[in-house]
Amino acid sequence: ASFBZAPPGBSKAGEKIFKTKCAECHTVGRGAGHKQGPNLNGLFGRQSGTTAGYSYSAANKNMAVTWZZKTLYDYLLNPKKYIPGTKMVFPGLKKPZBRADLIAYLKESTA
C-alpha cells in the first residue's frame, strides 16, 4: 500500500515512535550533531546521502532518492530492501499507521 492510502498521521504518536525506535541513532533539531545515523533536520526535499558531515554508504549516495512522504513511507517499511547496502540497521515499521505517524512527526520536527 502506498502513502496515498495511508491513514492520517498523528505527530504526537510519531514522536513516541521516534523516541523509542529512532532517537538512539538520529537527532532532529537544527544544529544537533550526528549520532550513529545522520541528523534529520531539513529531511524533506533532500536527496539521500547528502547531509553535510555524515559518512554515508555508497548505496545511500547512489540511490539518489528525494525524501518526501511517499519515499519515506516506502523506505520505512523495510530500509534494507529499499536501499540495499544501507548502513541503517533498523528493520522497519510494518504498520501503516506507525509509518504515517512517524512521517507526521518528522515533517514537524525537521522543518
Curated annotation (Swiss-Prot):
The keyword Cell membrane does not apply. Heme c binds at residues 22, 25-26, 88. It is found in: Mitochondrion intermembrane space. The modification N-acetylalanine is found at residue 1. The modification N6,N6,N6-trimethyllysine is found at residues 80, 94. Binds 1 heme c group covalently per subunit. Keywords: Acetylation, Electron transport, Heme, Iron, Metal-binding, Methylation, Mitochondrion, Respiratory chain, Transport. One of its GO terms (cellular component) is mitochondrial intermembrane space. One of its GO terms (molecular function) is metal ion binding. InterPro entries: Cyt_c-like_dom (IPR009056), Cyt_c-like_dom_sf (IPR036909), Cyt_c_1A/1B (IPR002327). Belongs to the cytochrome c family. Electron carrier protein. The oxidized form of the cytochrome c heme group can accept an electron from the heme group of the cytochrome c1 subunit of cytochrome reductase. Cytochrome c then transfers this electron to the cytochrome oxidase complex, the final protein carrier in the mitochondrial electron-transport chain. This is Cytochrome c. It comes from Cannabis sativa (Hemp).
